[in-house]
Amino acid sequence: QFRAVEQTKTYFEQALKEEPNRIPKFLWNAKMRFGKTFASYQLAKKMGLSRILILTFKPAVESAWREDLVSHIDFEGWQYISNKDARNNNLNIDQEFHRADKSKPIVVFGSFQDLLGTNESGGIKTKNEFIHATNWDLVIFDEYHFGAWKERAKELFEKEDEESAVDFDAEKYKKDEA
C-alpha cells in the first residue's frame, strides 16, 4: 500500500509539473484484499486533496469505502456522503453535500447506475447536479471492469469533455500560439 501511494503521488506530481493542463490518470491493478480503499484515502491525505469523488460500477462495495473512512483515526473529521447516508438523514445527496463543512475533506460515493439515470427530460437528475458542478481533486473509478466500456458510461464522460470544450476558441488559440 505504501509503495502504491508513493508511486502514484510521485507520478501525479511529475505529470502535473510536465503538463499542468493535462489531468493525470493512474491505474491500480490491485488484487482483492490489497486495501485499495484505505490506500486511496491515504493518497488523498498525503496529497492534501479535499474533494474526492468515488464512482463505482458495483454499489455493493459502498460499505467498505464508508467503513475505511469513518473508522480510521487517520481520517478523523473527514466527511462521507452517499445516497444511502443522505436518505438515512431524510435528505437527498445534494442536500447532504451542501450541508457539509467545506473546510474539511469531503468524500462523495456514487454509483454509475445512479449517475447514468436521467430526469424526465433526459437531463441530469437534480440531486446529481452538484457532482457535475464540483471541481473534484480526485476521482476514483472503482470496480471499473464491471462496466466502464458500456456505451452509457462512455457517454457520461464524453459529454463532460464536450461541455468543458464549449468555450474553446480554436482561432484565438492559433493566433495566440503563432
Language model: regions and residue ranges:
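SF2 helicase/translocase NTPase motor core
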Residues: 1-178
